[in-house]
């Protein structure tokens, strides 16, 4: 999502909230107080959104050839392939930091990371870019030579704080998720 679309979304949400809540709050506190509180509230909401998204990084998209190779879902000879995909609307703009071994990257909704690794057991750790917004999660995966594992990362909202949820997808769900997301390059590539 571009920066313009992000700001338009923030403004649209704030406008809807103001339209729904403004009249009832205005009648309770009075017009003069409302003229002072409304701008302060709006500044607070916009400030929170800026803070929440400030740790996001714009990941570099892979070229079409790399994306086509990723969507084949076949590991190179003697290697295993691990995907971490992210889809959905909950906290879609919030970046998720993904770590597999020494590899590090960040994805948002509609994006995926892919790692070709040696066969073995790997710990995949995922946390929101702003760690205070959601509880991080880890999942261990054991993958053999020629094996392909797809992990879906999502944020599940709680009353006050969300939690990152990692799910290993079956073959049909895995293919659907990989085909529906765009490949992002690692910030620190797998070794």
Language model segments and positions:
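Short loop/turn and low-complexity linker motifs enriched in small/turn-promoting residues
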Residues: 1-191
